[in-house]
A protein has these predicted regions:
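Polytopic transmembrane helical bundles with strong interfacial aromatic enrichment
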Residues: 1-465
Length: 465
């Protein structure tokens, strides 16, 4: 297929399925916590606006959660079908970590999801709120275990190699490896930020069409407060994550910077734009700021950033991809900070809900969080190459033995099936968003209907005959 061998087709297939999958957990994590906040506000204030927003977003959450589960299962199977070399080599670590995720997070989510989605008038309000909080907690726990596994692949420790296989010797070191805290914070905050932008864009769409209800205004306001607070925090977390990467994966940082060689005694410049050329080993058309690279990455003007030529050619990641994926992520992050700042200014001026240029800006920024997450993961995963377990196992040694034709057919099948199934799912979510929150109705009088209320009501109805 397109002149690619089975190895590269397997990489493309996994990148395709992962890219589809990551979108759903990112929104699920943020929406679950958002729903917990909405229900908490409803219980505290009895303001029907919060109840209306809860019912509106819980439907979208349910669709998104279902698609995330399906896409995640397919991705997990690929460890055995396409990457059996990796599973055989490192399965004693990645297998238990994924099992812990199922036992602690997925069971928690599955156990309380039904109560959360269908128990509003069937269980008491306290129990229902508890169920919503447990689902939100489950998404965070799931993030914990998944990122522990991925971070171990980036900065492996706590293991020995015995008879050509990884054997864990210190599970605390395996889980809390050097990059894990930064990656967990960075991804979790990215999920909250992406969800805020998603919610804000949905509200902006309704405001642009004159749907200026209290519920729409409330979710727009909440989303922009979240963006204002979280976007700058995310930038600071990203800076800390970058310093950690500089320490443990210097070749990745060199590729991100498009930096090929140092001049003795001079600080490293910051390349704003350019085109890293892997064949000529230089960055063409570079626009740079002297010394700023050293200042940002080492917080000093006396230190230099590692250069790509300091690493063997076979150990360098593809700088062209990593250079631009990082800049896409960082550029979108700056726009998010700008969005939050403009919202604060317009809020002060009393024009937050009436400025049509700003509403259009908020609408167009809706997918920016998800795009930034995808760009960030491209930076992370392509920047790790040519290793699947950094410095321990090469990606070429991890792939299963498949023919080029078989991989081509399976890749095309994935593209068609994913495009069809998840296209329908996305379309349905957009239909739900277009409907908007329903006007708040006064709560029903009396006690909530219990699980056996249907049978009881039926028996009473028969007696009335």
């Amino acid at each position: 297929m397109f002149g690619l061998d089975a190895f590269h087709l397997a990489r493309i297939q996994f990148a395709f399925t992962v890219s589809f999958h990551i979108i759903f957990p990112a929104i699920t994590i943020g929406l679950a916590s958002y729903l917990a906040v909405l229900e908490g506000l409803w219980l505290k204030t009895k303001n029907p606006t919060w109840r209306s927003l809860y019912h509106f977003w819980s439907k979208i959450f349910a669709v998104n959660f279902g698609m995330g589960v399906v896409s995640g299962l397919v991705m997990a199977y690929q460890f055995g079908t396409n990457w059996s070399g990796f599973s055989e080599f490192a399965g004693s670590i990645t297998g238990p970590l994924l099992t812990y995720e199922v036992l602690t997070a997925f069971f928690l989510e599955a156990g309380f999801l039904g109560v959360m989605l269908f128990g509003w008038n069937r269980v008491g309000p306290g129990l229902h709120f508890f169920a919503t909080c447990m689902v939100a907690l489950g998404t965070i726990i799931s993030t914990f275990w998944i990122l522990a596994s991925n971070s171990w692949m980036q900065t492996p420790q706590g293991f020995e190699i015995v008879n050509g296989q990884v054997v864990p010797v210190d599970w605390f070191a395996v889980i809390f490896n050097p990059s894990f805290p930064y990656r967990l914070l960075h991804m979790s905050v990215a999920a909250f930020l992406s969800s805020a932008l998603f919610v804000g864009a949905s509200a902006a769409w309704h405001l642009l069409r004159g749907n200026n209800t209290p519920a729409v205004r409330a979710m727009f306001s909440m989303a922009l407060w979240m963006t204002l607070i979280v976007a700058p925090i995310q930038a600071m977390i990203g800076d800390m994550h970058g310093l950690n990467t500089l320490k443990h994966q210097p070749a990745k940082i060199a590729a991100i910077e498009g930096h090929w060689e140092n001049i003795p005694g001079e600080p490293t410049p910051l390349l704003l734009f350019g085109w890293p050329d892997m064949q000529q080993e230089r960055t063409r058309y570079g626009l740079e700021i002297p010394a700023l690279g050293s200042l940002i990455l080492t917080h000093s003007l006396d230190k230099q950033v590692p250069a790509l030529k300091e690493f063997a050619a076979e150990d360098r990641p593809n700088a062209t991809i990593v250079f631009w994926s990082f800049r896409l992520m960082a550029g979108l992050g700056m726009l998010m900070i700008l969005l939050g700042a403009l919202a604060l200014w317009l809020r002060y001026r009393g024009r937050l809900y009436r400025s049509r240029p700003f509403l259009r800006f908020a609408l167009w920024m809706g997918p920016s969080g998800l795009i930034a997450i995808l760009a960030g993961w491209v930076t992370t995963e392509v920047g790790r190459q040519p290793w699947v377990v950094y410095g321990v196992q090469r990606t070429a040694d991890a792939v299963s033995a498949h023919g080029d034709l078989h991989m081509s057919i399976s890749l095309l099948t994935f593209i068609v099936v994913y495009g069809s199934v998840f296209g329908v799912g996305y379309s349905y979510m957009l239909r739900l968003i277009r409907k908007g929150p329903q006007e708040a109705q006064p709560p029903a009088s009396g006690t909530p209907a219990r699980p056996l209320s249907a049978a009881t009501d039926h028996a009473q109805h028969k007696e009335s005959w």
